[in-house]
Design a protein with these regions (language model features):
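Terminal amphipathic alpha-helical/low-complexity segments used for targeting or macromolecular assembly
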Residues: 1-184, 190, 350, 356-379
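Glycine-rich hexapeptide-repeat left-handed beta-helix
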Residues: 10-13, 25, 30, 234-235, ...
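General secondary-structure edge motif
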Residues: 13-17, 21, 129, 171-172, ...
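Conserved beta-strand and immediately adjacent loop positions that scaffold enzyme active sites
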Residues: 77, 196, 341
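Extended beta-solenoid/beta-helix repeat architectures
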Residues: 168-182, 186-277, 292-293, 319, ...
Length: 379
């Protein structure tokens, strides 16, 4: 059996993060959505997404999947699984029980489908429409909006911690740090936690990945996930639920933030209730508001519908797409959305929506030259 993780329409409300990836490659918790599915399915997966992104995934295509996606004769049984859905053991069991010609649904949400028909991204709904519907009763959790990535991170870290630590023993806990709730702390081999660190895992689990470094004087309050080769700088104050993805460097004060991978917020400054994509960099003393002075509900700009939408949240900070950067002393307003590969600098607050490939700040924006953007990304 082979599995293809498909994008549903939530990919549009998950921008700017889905400009550069399928939904399945969004990180929330310790894992990306794909990594969680693969852990529980005990199988590699492939991807069905927008045409302009599909070529990214074909290089790693499993036998038979390419034929299924592009309409040639398939030679392997395939189940399509919604990449926006959080995988669970119970859900995996229900999916694996599907017979050819059946689909698993909850309301109008397609969770999974076992179809022998040729499937393209644009005809997925029409192909699965006539399948026998099997209702899944337990409530499924999904990524439906970009702010879900940080607001659902607490539950995701807890679930992933149970998966990744099941039947395993943590590396030795250092004697020179202060720990409360040590039964909820798991350190992978090769990770280093230096003297003077304070880790409180009573409020939620703390996972420290392989070769991660937690430098002197760091204060951590779970839930927290520090990925492989991540670094938390000296004296940092980290509140849960926070994910520091592989290769990230962070410092200052951080509260309920998801860093995807290879991004830096290495200096002082506040960042809360936020999502930072891959290969982003935030200059020293960057500060981001996450609460309106009147405590009102926060609205953010929806790039797909080209209008402001309600989040239902009182706390919402910065949502920054891949490869975007900001200079020292940058200040972001509550609920700011920054697209892909933008460069922000100067005094004052930039607009609350900064499109992709913009260069400038509060005094005006110009288009970031694509060749210069590519040069920076390639470095």
């Amino acid at each position: 059996m082979s599995y293809i993780l498909f994008d549903d329409n939530s990919r549009y409300s998950l921008q700017p993060f889905t400009h550069t990836r399928a939904i399945a490659d969004i990180r929330c918790g310790i894992y990306t959505m794909r990594e969680r599915w693969e852990q529980l399915l005990r199988s590699k997966t492939d991807t069905l997404t927008e045409e302009h992104l599909q070529s990214i995934y074909t290089y790693n295509t499993l036998p038979g999947i390419l034929e299924t996606v592009y309409g040639m004769e398939a030679n392997v049984a395939t189940i399509f699984v919604n990449g926006s859905v959080f995988a669970t053991e119970a859900l995996v069991k229900a999916i694996n029980k599907l017979e050819a010609g059946q689909k698993l649904v909850q309301g109008d949400v397609l969770i999974a489908a076992n179809t022998e028909d040729t499937v393209y991204y644009k005809n997925l709904n029409s192909v699965t429409e006539g399948l026998e519907a099997i209702a899944y009763e337990p409530e499924v959790q999904r990524l439906k909006n970009n702010w879900d990535i940080f607001s659902k991170n607490d539950a995701a870290i807890r679930a992933d911690f149970s998966i990744i630590t099941k039947g395993r023993k943590s590396a030795a806990l250092p004697a020179h740090i202060t720990i409360t709730g040590k039964e909820n702390l798991f350190i992978e081999e090769g990770a280093k936690v230096y003297a003077g660190c304070i880790i409180n895992a009573e409020a939620g689990p703390v996972y420290i990945g392989k070769d991660a470094e937690i430098l002197e004087g760091t204060m951590i309050r779970g839930p927290l996930a520090a990925g492989e080769h991540s670094v938390i700088k000296m004296g940092a104050k980290i509140y849960g639920a926070t994910t520091i993805g592989p290769g990230c460097k962070v410092g200052g004060e951080i509260n309920n933030v998801v860093f995807f991978a290879n991004s830096n917020k290495a200096h002082d400054g506040y960042l809360g209730n936020a999502v930072i994509g891959e290969w982003c960099n935030m200059g020293a003393d960057t500060n981001c508001s996450n609460l309106k002075n009147n405590y009102d509900e926060i609205k953010i700009w929806d790039e797909h519908t080209n209008k402001s939408v309600k989040t239902g949240l009182t706390f919402c900070g910065l949502l920054m797409g891949d490869h975007s950067k900001c200079a020292i002393n940058t200040a972001f307003n509550t609920g700011t959305v920054v697209g892909v590969s933008s460069n922000i600098f100067g005094s004052g607050f930039p607009e609350k929506f900064v499109p992709s490939f913009c260069w400038g700040g509060s005094e005006g924006m110009t288009t970031y030259d694509i060749n210069r953007a590519m040069e920076t990304a390639n470095r």
